[in-house]
Each structure stands twice: as C-alpha cells, then as structure tokens.
Amino acid sequence: MKRLLVTACAAALAVTAAASAQPLTVPTKKAGKLIVGFDVPAPSFWNGRATGTTIKNPSGFEYALSQAIAMKLGISKVQYLRAPFSGLFSPASKKYDFALEEVTITAQRAKVVSFSAPYFDANQGVLIRKGLAKPTSIAALKKLQLCAQSSTTGLAYIQHKIRPAKKPLVYSSSSTAAFDAVEAGKCDALILDVPIVAAQSKKKPGAYGGVAGQIVTHEQYGAVMDKGSKLKPSLDKAINALKANGTIKRLVKKWLLNPIPPILK
C-alpha cells in the first residue's frame, strides 16, 4: 500500500513538474505569431522602406524592442503590419497584437485603447528652421510660427501651455509634412517628441537649425492594443523584464538620445 502511494505521489509530482515547464500560451491574434503595428517615417525608431503594408530591411529602437519582446514571450514568428498613426485610436478591433509608434500614454487615449507598461520616457522637442536664432526659453516660443502633427501631445502643449501669438500650423497625415514645413521655412519650430526630432535632425543635419531644446512634460510611450486586450499582462511582464535587465536602456543609447538637448524653461 505504501509502495503504491509513493509511486502515485511520484507520478503526480512528475506531471506537475512537466506542466510547469511548458510555456504558457500567449493570447495573440494568431497562435504562435506576433503581429506588430508600425508606421513610417520614424527615424531611429523604425528605419527601413515601407512596401505595401509591411517594411523591408527594418531596424531602429522600436523594431529592436519588438524583437526583444517576442523573445521574452517565447514567440519566434513576428509579422509587421503598417498601421497609420491617425487610426491608432479608433475603437474598432485592430489587426495587430500591439503597435509601437512613439505613442504617449494619456487618460483620454486610454478610454478607447489599452496601453502596455511604459517603455520610454519622452519630453517634447523643439526642432527649428535653418537660420533661426535658437530660442532659449518657453516664453521665446510664443513669438514664433509653431507647427505640430495632429492628434499629438505636442499640439496639445502648444494650444494649452505655450499659447503662441500666431495660430499653429497643423499637419494631419504624418510627421513628414511637419518636417517639410520646417525645412521649407514655413514653420519656425516644430513641437514633437524629442527623440523623433533629434533623430530627424541627425538624419538631415543641413536641412534644419537643429534641436533648440526640450520641454519637460513627463510623458511616457506605451504599446497600443485593443481595449481590454488579454495580451496586456504578458506584454507588461515582458517590457518590465526588459527594463529591469538593462535591455531597453542599451537600445535607447544605441538608437536614440545622444547628445541630450538642453531643457527649456
């Protein structure tokens, strides 16, 4: 009897150990595959050439982050799906598991989508046109012709905090039009996330007057998912692990802020 009991206990322990060794199923849209939303241009975040709905020869901070996340989740197949920024905050079900598109976490946006744990701390940067004397304070920005991309926290900051004398120019499609306006001299200064403008200035150093500085706004980027996505707990755990082991810090140093623009007050 004792022998049978010992054998039964050993068998039960073996089953338990085997079960615990098996990876938990990650609730992605397609089993065994991770679909990541992206948009371009996003220098240093997403480098590569968009072809239809995907991207060729991808590299950059968010691309590398997506690969690291997939590895943490135990998923080897990753598909990249172009998802324009303008459509990220639609309440409709999304075709991707999550999107990495330099999206600032806000309470308003969180009403229609779910955000992951933050993966990057971002302030607003000031990219100025060539030939313009660099503004050294936020007050100096009030006199300039400012511009921003629509639906961004940069535009909200202009409207509610800076309140310039001239109505800001707003570009809806993507950051490309806003960058073009600064390059053409139509806009004195573009207010957009500092790593984005820093990357653009580095990419085309002769086209702009550089990044005059950054405005501290205590913003954070998070991955965008369907509201109430079941993937969120697993994604949060993966991102927090990548922060804890230094992976994200190394990626920031490799792809983003270097040097750090001065703080405008």
Task: Say what each PLM segment does.
Residues Q22-P23, T153-V170, G209-G210, N240-K265:
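Ligand-binding clefts/hinges and TM-proximal coupling segments of bilobed small-molecule sensing domains
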Residues P23-E101:
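Extracytoplasmic small-molecule ligand-binding "clamshell" domains
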